[in-house]
Curated annotation (Swiss-Prot):
Residues 46-62 have a biased composition (Low complexity). The lineage of its organism: Eukaryota, Amoebozoa, Evosea, Eumycetozoa, Dictyostelia. It comes from Dictyostelium discoideum (Social amoeba). It comes from the Eukaryota. Residues 41-62 are annotated as: Disordered. This is Putative uncharacterized protein DDB_G0287867.
Length: 93
């Protein structure tokens, strides 16, 4: 029995709704591509985190741009109605 060495290359990482996947509806406006530019665009829409103190004032926490991108990425990935669809290339040596 011969062992095969192989390498998996991720060509594209696509995040789409389950409904879109079932309907085979792959319109560009229905698919969110997890690229750096898409994440940085959507990171601007993230609200800053806040908590209410006993005095009734609401202090806000400043999030650096990098941290807001990471937070937004986690919000996108952790949504249960979303799925990742990876287009991969497998090289067998």
């Amino acid at each position: 029995m011969k062992l095969l060495n192989f390498k998996i290359i991720i060509i594209q990482d696509v995040l789409c709704n389950n409904k879109d996947y079932k309907d085979n509806n792959y319109n560009n406006n229905k698919i969110e591509r997890l690229t750096t530019s898409a994440l940085s665009r959507s990171a601007n829409r993230i609200p800053t985190t806040s908590s209410t103190s006993t005095s009734g004032t609401i202090p806000t926490t400043t999030i650096t741009p990098r941290q807001s991108i990471i937070n937004n990425r986690n919000q996108i990935i952790n949504k249960p109605q979303k799925q990742h669809h990876l287009l991969v290339q497998i090289e067998i040596h």
